[in-house]
């Protein structure tokens, strides 16, 4: 997975710790301003900030769904597993000495640890794994994140002006990936970029209407 991601972003400059607070326009460019007053200039802006995208407009139909994953320290037997398991939950092969199990679904934006979710993840381990490989759990950890879901469980892309009703200066939105961002994001990003550069979409008009933000408004 890491090699796939690295290949996607090989020509991308990543700027961290830039908490965007405001975007203004001047001379055909968007001025992106952070909380310290630092500025970046961009011809095109794409908002892809998960459930926090609702800060752009109350009309955006995104539902926050928090999820907790559990990390279990691999043992001598489990380290040899070369397969991931999916059974309502998921159980990954070891990465950097830990397996990942998850994830819970809670209809809120709470990122606090929940013992009930931790136990549910651990108890979800299939019996054949528990009996033969994970009969003794020695160490566990966790991570809680928030998914951005839509009412029809499908992502969206489009122009910000479709959402706000106000003309935007090349500002777009891409979101609603839910728990399937790794699958959906590359495809939806390609559709959005194709739209931005006024190229021919690889999908027909009926399918386009089912994928854009307009279907949710």
Where are these regions (language model features)?
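Internal, well-ordered alpha-helical segments in soluble enzyme and binding-protein domains
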Residues: 1-8, 16-19, 66, 87, ...
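Active-site substrate-recognition segment that forms the wall
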Residues: 44, 49-169
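C-terminal catalytic lobe of FAD-dependent flavoproteins
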Residues: 135-217
């Amino acid at each position: 997975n890491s090699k796939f991601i690295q290949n996607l972003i090989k020509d991308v400059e990543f700027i961290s710790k830039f908490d965007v607070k405001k975007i203004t326009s001047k001379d055909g460019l968007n001025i992106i301003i952070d909380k310290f007053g630092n500025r970046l200039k961009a011809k095109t802006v794409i908002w892809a900030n998960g459930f926090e995208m609702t800060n752009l407009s109350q009309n955006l139909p995104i539902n926050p769904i928090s999820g907790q994953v559990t990390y279990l320290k691999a043992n001598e037997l489990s380290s040899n597993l070369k397969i991931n398991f999916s059974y309502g939950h998921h159980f990954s092969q070891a990465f950097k000495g830990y397996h990942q199990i998850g994830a819970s679904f809670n209809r809120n934006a709470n990122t606090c640890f929940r013992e009930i979710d931790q136990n549910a993840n651990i108890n979800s381990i299939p019996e054949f794994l528990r009996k033969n490989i994970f009969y003794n759990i020695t160490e566990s950890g966790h991570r809680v994140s928030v998914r951005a879901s839509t009412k029809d469980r499908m992502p969206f892309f489009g122009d910000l002006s479709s959402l706000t009703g106000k003309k935007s200066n090349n500002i777009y939105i891409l979101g609603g990936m839910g728990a399937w961002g790794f699958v959906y994001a590359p495809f939806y990003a390609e559709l959005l970029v194709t739209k931005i550069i006024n190229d021919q979409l690889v999908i027909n008009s009926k399918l386009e209407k089912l994928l854009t933000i307009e279907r949710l408004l």
